[in-house]
């Protein structure tokens, strides 16, 4: 009888230890993610080169003198079903003379900056955004134009170069 009591007591102690383990701290598992609109395909290459041609420095001899606008466009195609809008966010180095709406020339010509605008004359400076609806052919297009503007009326000959990055988000 004494032996049965010891075995029973040992079983109770073991069971108590096991049941204590059953009351350990809980662990929370967080599972996250996003269901997103899939990207469209850039129509053409991922770089758009706009050649403004040869401009005489004398055409930029007055403050805010500008070259004629040069039209171009950026497009995406094959947008997945359910993608209804694409927003382009523009970024680049702002021009010191007009940081809200022109970009700095990183070429060798001095006294100039580069303007970028919608085809409707709305400026597309650093930080600008432009949302375009996806059409029935599952494409979206941003018609734009660019030109050189004289910053100080003392443009010097040289190369013209500006880099503007358009980051696309899909809805």
Roles of regions detected by a PLM:
Residues 2-6, 20-171:
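Mature extracellular/passenger domains of Gram-negative fimbrial/pilin and adhesin proteins
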Residues 9-17:
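Bacterial N-terminal signal peptides
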